[in-house]
Amino acid sequence: MAGEIPDFQAEVRTGTGKGAARQARREGYVPGIVYGGGQEPLSINVPYNDLLNRLKKGRFLQTLFNLKVEGQEDVRVICRGVQRDVVKDLPTHVDFMRLRRTSRVNLFIHVTFENHDKAPGLKRGGTLTVVRPEVELEVTAGDIPDHLTVDLTDRQIGDVIHINDIKLPEGAVPTINRNFVIANISAPSGLRSSDNEEEAEEA
């Protein structure tokens, strides 16, 4: 589960339009906007290096931040988009949405797999095929999980892992209302070839 909410520093951006945004970039900032929460949008500047470091850590769009802006009350936000330079792939603008801890939000949560060494199907040479490396969940803003965990213990060749097989955090609900596939364990190619030959002989 998500732990302590990290702080994110920003400054109020004076001026509007492309000119102010370009000036911010020249001074080492990434222009951004904070919206929602029943308040007027707030134009901000985010330190470029801070944003880049956060992006490199991963799960930036799945992280709830405590936004600290001088002269403003601290507010919980979540990133709703990062625009990037089409050539350099570096951030040029960032959007944040204000949230309450009890707000509900849809997020893609990463799926991890554990106990590979306890899966007989993998020991026999089977291959774990991941169909959905991320799952979109509706979650409470104050309880965003870091990831979902799939336990591979006792999994055999031919096993199919569905979303209903995963223990979801309390209050988390998949946005897709069906028991969709997360992953499966397929037979090694040699075993599949042998099975096909046997079927051909029987035919």
Curated annotation (Swiss-Prot):
Task: Please give the CDD domains that the UniProt record associates with this protein.
Answer: Ribosomal_L25_TL5_CTC
Give the UniProt entry's GO cellular component terms. Answer: cytosolic large ribosomal subunit
Tell me a GO biological process for this protein: translation
For this protein, the record's InterPro entries field holds:
Rbsml_bL25/Gln-tRNA_synth_N, Ribosomal_bL25/Gln-tRNA_synth, Ribosomal_bL25_b-dom, Ribosomal_bL25_C, Ribosomal_bL25_long, Ribosomal_L25_dom, Ribosomal_uL5_bac-type
Stretches assigned to coiled coil? none
Q: Which UniProt keywords apply?
A: Ribonucleoprotein, Ribosomal protein, RNA-binding, rRNA-binding
One Gene Ontology molecular-function label:
5S rRNA binding
Q: Which NCBIfam families match?
A: bL25_bact_ctc, PRK05618.1-2, PRK05943.1
Tell me the protein family, please: Belongs to the bacterial ribosomal protein bL25 family. CTC subfamily.
Task: Give a short account of what the protein does.
Answer: This is one of the proteins that binds to the 5S RNA in the ribosome where it forms part of the central protuberance.
Q: What binding partners and quaternary form does the record give?
A: Part of the 50S ribosomal subunit; part of the 5S rRNA/L5/L18/L25 subcomplex. Contacts the 5S rRNA. Binds to the 5S rRNA independently of L5 and L18.
Q: What is the protein name given in its UniProt record?
A: Large ribosomal subunit protein bL25
- From what organism does this protein derive? Cereibacter sphaeroides (strain ATCC 17023 / DSM 158 / JCM 6121 / CCUG 31486 / LMG 2827 / NBRC 12203 / NCIMB 8253 / ATH 2.4.1.) (Rhodobacter sphaeroides)
Gene designation = rplY
